[in-house]
A protein has these predicted regions:
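Surface loop/turn motifs at the tips and blade-to-blade linkers of beta-strand repeat domains
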Residues: 45-51, 87, 102-104, 169-171, ...
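Blade-level signature of beta-propeller repeat domains, shared across WD40, Kelch, NHL, RCC1
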Residues: 414-438
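Bacterial N-terminal signal peptides
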Residues: 10-19
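Asp-box/WD-like beta-propeller blade repeats and closely related beta-sheet repeat scaffolds
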Residues: 138-195
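Conserved beta-propeller blade signature
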Residues: 63-67, 123-127, 201-205, 265-269, ...
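Beta-strand-rich domains and repeat architectures in extracellular enzymes and scaffolds
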Residues: 45-71, 347-355
Length: 438
């Protein structure tokens, strides 16, 4: 049954990939689903000249908090004024700073979210890399390294400073040294995306930090999705008893988390090996199926005990052959969460994700927008874009995938719904775009 399900999944992903253009043309000509309108999409730059803007969060009045990976947290107020609030070690111009915070590779100051009761409690949450809890660890890539944290702050009324830092998660794993893999520098596969779910709990996505044991070892906070309260304690109904904070495990590098408006179902967007990025409906206690450890599933030894890019990690090869060697969703696991979508063979680098909300989005309302950073490898096109994914009600397949015509091709790192039902997108090139539909 699992093998049949896997075949259908891969076939569906391939079919979606080759039908992008046809789907777009049909929607434009025929008015899309059930006669609903196809919206006119427009984009404009609202900020530029930033350094790796990673994430955004909005207040009710339209003020935008944003992170820059190697600098810190700032806010652009509704009036347009920019206040630099909280920097990392070495950053200049910030009202305050955390000298334990740093950036390296894919790590740094990443996710930012506002408490659902922000108007009353003024609380904000940040995900960042930190040296504060290294203790005696972090001496090699093969030991525990508590190098990522989640912090809470209070923001003052006029958005000019933050205070009352409290570290609510202190043990998310970090990769401290270079290893023998593509993109193998320190800070690799660092996760960092956060979101509040409809029940008011904080969800935190992490990465496998290029350590083979991580995704399937529930004694380590890596390759997991947390569901925690404002103090960092696990939801009482989380099913993974090894660590009450864990909602799911077996992930590679979670980059997007959002919740389907119609039913509150949680979905992740995740980096896969080469051309196997995935979008997955999460199941409490479920396994993402990623197991890059050497000497498992018929594999031999791998560089630095990590088989995530094998069997030919430095050169292009047929994606299906690579996927068979170390599959992103391994059907060996009985608790596997089958992905709804795989980026099978069409560039790679799925970043953040956000469900489109508001009637202005027409036929796209309720569909998932995903940023594709478009790493071309082994002859594949770069394909930097935003895709609109129409996920089936059961969350186990997609009905269609089309490109959002935003008019620019960038490395879309972060996506967030903002004021006026507009989609905001941050890019590695240093801009934040407002994408509107009408």
């Amino acid at each position: 049954m699992n093998m049949l399900r896997k075949f259908i999944l891969v076939f569906s992903a391939l079919a979606a990939a080759v039908s992008f253009t046809a789907t777009t043309a049909y929607a434009a000509d025929h008015g899309g689903d059930h006669g609903m309108k196809v919206p006119k999409i427009g984009s404009m730059v609202v900020m530029s000249g930033l350094e790796n803007p990673w994430d955004m969060a909005f207040t009710a009045d339209g003020s935008m908090f944003y992170t820059e990976k190697c600098k810190g947290l700032s806010v652009k107020t509704a009036s347009g004024k920019v206040n630099a609030l909280y920097g990392m070690k070495g950053s200049k111009g910030y009202k305050s700073a955390g000298n334990d915070l740093f950036c390296e590779g894919q790590a740094g100051m990443l996710g930012v979210v506002l408490d659902p009761n922000f108007k009353k409690n003024r609380k904000l949450y940040l995900y960042s890399t930190s040296t504060k809890y290294h203790a005696s660890g972090c001496k090699t890539n093969f030991e525990k390294c508590d190098g990522n944290i989640v912090m809470s702050f209070k923001v003052n009324k006029d958005l000019t400073k933050v205070s009352d830092r409290t570290d609510i998660v202190k043990d998310i794993q970090y990769k401290p040294f270079e290893s023998n893999q593509p993109f193998g520098g320190p800070g690799a596969h660092n996760g960092g995306r956060m979101a509040f779910g409809p029940e008011g709990y904080l969800w935190v996505g992490t990465g496998d930090r290029h350590r083979g044991v991580c995704p399937q070892d529930n004694s380590l906070v890596c390759g997991v999705v947390l569901r925690i309260d404002a103090d960092g304690k696990g939801h009482p109904k989380n099913k993974i008893k090894a660590d009450q904070r864990f909602y799911t495990y077996g992930h590679r590098n979670v980059q997007g988390i959002d919740f389907r408006p119609s039913d509150g179902q949680a979905f992740t967007a995740e980096h896969g090996p080469w051309h196997n990025d995935e979008i997955t409906a999460l199941v409490n206690g479920g396994n993402g199926g990623w197991d890059p450890h050497e000497k498992r599933a018929g594999r031999g030894a791998c560089p630095d005990q990590y088989c995530g890019y094998e069997p030919n990690q430095m050169e292009g090869m047929t994606p299906a052959v690579r996927a068979a060697y170390t599959p992103m969703s391994d059907t060996r696991f009985d608790d596997l969460m089958f992905p709804a979508w795989q980026n099978n063979g069409y560039s790679q680098g799925t970043g953040s994700a956000a469900f489109l909300t508001g009637k202005n989005w027409g036929i796209y309302e309720g569909r998932l927008a995903t940023g594709i950073m478009g790493i071309g490898f082994g002859g594949t096109p770069g394909g930097m874009r935003i895709d609109i994914v129409d996920i089936a009600p059961d969350g186990e397949s997609v009905k269609s995938v089309i490109h959002m015509p935003v008019g620019v091709s960038k490395r879309f790192r972060g996506l967030e719904m903002g004021p006026g039902n507009a989609l905001y997108a941050s890019t590695d090139e240093g801009e934040i775009y407002k994408i509107s539909a009408q």
